[in-house]
Amino acid sequence: MATTHLDVCAVVPAAGFGRRMQTECPKQYLSIGNQTILEHSVHALLAHPRVKRVVIAISPGDSRFAQLPLANHPQITVVDGGDERADSVLAGLKAAGDAQWVLVHDAARPCLHQDDLARLLALSETSRTGGILAAPVRDTMKRAEPGKNAIAHTVDRNGLWHALTPQFFPRELLHDCLTRALNEGATITDEASALEYCGFHPQLVEGRADNIKVTRPEDLALAEFYLTRTIHQENT
């Protein structure tokens, strides 16, 4: 079936290991309830009617993905990821077909809310560069002295945001910016940073702070709490 300008492809880079989780199992394959974190993250994307396909970039040596129901899902495409996140995203973009817009979502960010996703997707009607979900910084921020666990100074938090995912951009623009940034040796920490490097200014779409990324062991219980609460709210 041919895509329309409203159809969106999502790319999920899932080739990382996540050593801060202190576990032999890659964090995206840890379970919350009866599903892995990766499954929760992908199903949140597919729950929106505009998301027609999800491309998941996994490690070439990954033997776990094939055991998941996702492996046989008709809307899922699997590609080999790279050593770095940007390499995996580029591999996903190449498999995104003719989708005009793409979402990029962390494999270990399972608590995405549908209202946040809908507001992010609405950027395709008003923006040529796209944007990201983000949360305003609420805590006092401190800059450490170089090489020391000592405060150098307090950072003004006004105008500071925590970057979240999904991040949402025109497919060709993201591909070109990632390619240029990598070729020129730029440091790419997320997809938006590639656009910033090329002179673009993506929009900030305020999202819920409970859209957490599971990075450390204590995050797993917190994500389970948020997911359980969300499911309860949707069923009442």
Curated annotation (Swiss-Prot):
What Gene Ontology molecular function terms does this protein carry? 2-C-methyl-D-erythritol 4-phosphate cytidylyltransferase activity; identical protein binding; magnesium ion binding
Cellular component GO terms, alphabetical: cytosol
Q: Residues at site: Positions MEP for the nucleophilic attack?
A: 157, 213
Q: How is activity influenced by pH?
A: Optimum pH is 8.3.
The record's listing under InterPro entries reads: IspD, IspD/TarI, IspD/TarI_cytidylyltransf_bact, ISPD_synthase_CS, Nucleotide-diphossugar_trans
> For this protein, what reaction is catalysed?
2-C-methyl-D-erythritol 4-phosphate + CTP + H(+) = 4-CDP-2-C-methyl-D-erythritol + diphosphate
Q: Which cysteines are joined by disulfide bonds?
A: none
- Tell me the cofactors it needs: Mg(2+); Mn(2+); Co(2+)
Listed name of the protein: 2-C-methyl-D-erythritol 4-phosphate cytidylyltransferase
Q: Which gene encodes it?
A: ispD
